[in-house]
Structure formats: structure tokens, C-alpha cells
Amino acid sequence: MPASIVVVGGGIGGLLTANLLAKRLDRTEATITLIDATGMHVFQPGWLYVALDQANARWLARDTRALLRREVRLVIDQALHIDVGQRRVTLARGDNVEFDYLVVATGATLARDEIPGLRETTHDFYSSAGAERLREALRGFNGTRLVVSVPPMPFKCPPAPVEFTLLADEFLRKRGVRDRTTITYVSPLDRVFPIASVADMVDGYFGRRSIETRMSFNLQRVDGDMLVSDAGEEVPFDLAVSIPPNRGAPVVMSSGLGNSRGWIPADPRTLAVRGTNGIYVVGDASDLPTSKNGSTAHFEAPRVAEQIIAAVEGRVPNPVRSRYRGLVICPFEVGGGKATVLVFDYDRAPPPLRPNRLWHAATWLFNRTYWFTVKSGRL
């Protein structure tokens, strides 16, 4: 009887894992089911460009079915509960999907309501609607005080708020309002980026572009036109771009799979969910000490696929193909038609390469070829 493999989540981690499994396993060996709440896959890195009037949100969404290999069964429904003991996923319609192997790729969710006043008063670009609203706000912004704030780690794509700040500086210069605008970057960290070598690079760009910083600022609430920290410090604004706190998906919380923030404890090398058998996590949903972004999922998916395939075929997993070492390769826009790339893993974080136009062009090429590569599993 074929093994039942279920993937929960239709983001990049879920899509890649399902397609890799379908590519290497025959239908007589396994059935592969992907459960996705909306049936639409969104290229989330593109939201940054929507906010800055460089892309259209309609370009960023595609039908999930069109991105899956035909061997993958797609179930469009909300996963409400994962029963590890009974090995089944309960859906909103009341159906149960049983599994022998499970991949949890439910991502991260935005917890806007954890900060009083955040939803009502500030903007962010971590959703299609949010990016479009921010674009309109920037179009009408005529100067004074722009503030960009980030939540405590972890949150999705840590480079994105820094990229936005640098690109917003460029955007406002082109509009002729930068000379009457102060830009302030606010973070709970003691430096502008978690990796010291990257923080040093960003400090240089911020300094040359007269971008101010407020570090060790833990946002507690938003009062009118003021960000207020837990220590009572205040940062006034006319336009605030505040990235909401992140947490795990509701299905993770309801199933007792996550920690207090909903992140799933996993083995950092195998990505197996701790305390379970045959259950893995891919992408933002885990508690691993690495970046939450598409690159992470890209490198994790083949490792999980190899382990499941080996189990189905009754062999030992290939030690090279089945072990994740924390590798992340992340493009990083700095403005002026230039970008760099961040390359790091669990053990090393070398200084970023000198920003240049080649990396910027490579970033745009990747963005445009994304849809053609995700189905093949060659992303």
C-alpha cells in the first residue's frame, strides 16, 4: 500500500517539498497531498517592491495548482488541528486527512494586535493589502518624519525593513521631499541587523544617507503619532512603517506542536519535529536559529524530501543530501541600482560582498524567473 505523505502549507517550503517528493517517488510508492488554505501562492519578497511603486501586487499571486506537479493532490481548506498520535490533519470542513509522513510548512503569521495602536495607526508591507496601502501613503507623503520599526526576532525576512529604509530614502529623493524628511530606523536590538558584519555595512549606508537610528527600543504601544517603548521612550512620526511581531500559525498552537510563540522545536540538522516520528518542519514555522525567509525553505526542502523518500524506499538517507547546515543565501538591496548577497549558515557569517549592479540585476532576474522554477524544484 502506498505511503501517505501530507504537506500542510502552500508557501515556498510546502510547494518545493511536495514537488520534490512527487518528482522522485512513484505513485505506487506514495500518495502526496498538499493542504493549502487559499489555493493561491504569493511571492512574498515582491511586496517590498509593491510598497515602493516598483511592482504590481497582481503579478505576485498564482494559482497553487498551476505550480504543483500533477502527481500532487491539492486540498484547498484550512488545517485546524494536527493529531500526532492518530496521525491525521483535521480540516475546517470537518474532513480528516491521514498521514504516514507529515511536513509542516505553515509559515509565520503577523500578530498586529499584540501592540496596541499598531493596526490602526501604522503601515507595513508584509501582505499584499498592506503593501498597496503603504504605496498610496508614500505617494502622498510630503515630508517631515518617516519612522521604520521592527519587532523582536524572529520575524520574516530580517533584511527587508533595512532594504525598505534604504529604498525609501531613494524614493523620497526622486520625489524631491527627502531634504525635508527625517528617516529613523527603530529596533529592539543593540545594532541595526542581527549579524555584526551586515550591521557594520548598514551603519555605513545609514550614515552616508543621514538616516537616524534608535536601538534597544522595545515597542510597547502606538499612541497617536508616537511610538512608545516599554521604558517610556518616545519616537514621533508622521508616517510609521512598523513590522508587526511574528508568531507561529494557529494550527501549530492548537495542536500543541509549538513553543509559547508557536515556533516548532526541530532538530537543526534533520528538521524532524522533536518528540515525533516521521514529522518534519520546513520554512518559517520552525524554531531553528536561522533566518525566516524563502532561501531557508529552499535549502531545507530537499533535505526533508530525501529523508522521507529514503524511509519510503526502506534505505538509509544520503548523509549529504539529508543534512541541513543552516545555509541561507539572501539578496540584499541597498539602492542606487546596487545589491549584495548575504551568505551564512549555523557556523559562519562572513562579511557581505561589496554591493554592485550585478547582484541587483541577479535579484531582479530571480524575481522574474521564480514562477518558472518553483514547479521543477530547481528554485
Where do the PLM segments sit?
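FAD-binding core/adjacent interface of flavoenzyme oxidoreductases
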Residues: 1-4, 72-163, 170-176, 241
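FAD-site-proximal beta/loop scaffold in flavoenzymes
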Residues: 118-142, 234-300, 306, 310
